Amino acid sequence: GTGRGIGVEVRVTDLKGTSLLEKNSFGLSVNFYGNIHLGTDKTNNYGELLGLYLAMDIASQTGDKKIFGDSNLVIFFWSKGLFRKDSLNEDTISLILKVTEKRKNFEKTGGKIEYVSGDINPADLGFHK
């Protein structure tokens, strides 16, 4: 989600709200708050998509089989390869294709991705409330 008026941040947590991003295998640096700061040139939807990608990456390391997210767009459309190419930039399209492939593999191995309301999502940054 968006964070503290400084741009987009990504947060991935366990059910208790503890950040899991230290386990990301991409070397993305985690800030003091346990989030990855993307700056102001990425959209919130891009951040949500990257969050799902990172969550699947972390789940593959930990053996977790359930991932929850609060973005309808990412969970029900983009991560299934459903998007309008003409309305998105190349970075977002590239990430959509990676997430779609990763989701297929995650689900083939018994993984599930489910929607949860932002009101009860422990990873929700809460700045939109």
Question: Where are the regions that the model predicts?
Answer:
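Metal-dependent nuclease catalytic cores in nucleic-acid-processing enzymes
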Residues: 46-63
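Residue-level detector of functional hotspots within protein domains
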Residues: 35, 51-53, 97-99
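RNase H-like nuclease fold core
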Residues: 1-46, 58
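C-terminal functional segments of enzyme domains
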Residues: 3-5, 10, 24, 65-68, ...
